[in-house]
Amino acid sequence: ASVGGKPIIFGLTILVIVWALSGLYRVLPDEQGVVLRFGKYVNTTQPGLHYHFPTPFERVLTPKVTKVNRVDVGFRPASDTGRSSGVGNVPEESLMLTGDENIVDINYSVFWVIKDAQKFLFNIQSPIETVKAASETAMREVIAKNRIQNILTEGRSKIEIEVQEITQIILDEYGSGIQVTQVQTQQADPPEQVIDAFRDVQAARADRERSKNE
């Protein structure tokens, strides 16, 4: 009986070894490892070879933390709208009130990375919607403090920096684990129905400036 049991014991030993070795895992240079024990956070590991208790006790999530993600606000690229070309405008996101009570139609993109994988995975449900909502709040706040002339001309870069800073503050308050790397204005115009009249006013103003300088 003892002879017949040896293959079984040997087979079980091999299975245990294979199971134990399944706990080895590698975190790539562009990742962070988030170790979960029965679904609860244990610790975060950095790039390299690591070990965790095998399934069903622990598992590891490895989100890409150096990948630059992009969220578009006020518009959707053709690839997202099913159109063959151009962009689809989203007025409910893009139309904003300026400090001098004009309306501006502004499209912009927010670029972001994961700075804390544990917070990113556990504190927010939808990263895209979270970034969009935070940046829209920030943009509306900043636009409301600026005159339309400033928004459409030399003030853009300063506005982008301020929006990035406020968006980051909001995301940090959420404990989102997200780092905003850039806010980039894609387009800023008066609404379509008044754009021609606005451009006429701008041209007249430029003519007056030229006349003064001559």
What are these regions (language model features)?
Residues P91-I114, Q118, N123, P127, ...:
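Amphipathic, coiled-coil-like alpha-helical scaffolding segments used for oligomerization/assembly
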Residues E192-E214:
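Long, charge-rich amphipathic alpha-helical coiled-coil "stalk/tentacle" segments
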Residues S2-L24:
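Single-pass alpha-helical transmembrane signal-anchor segments
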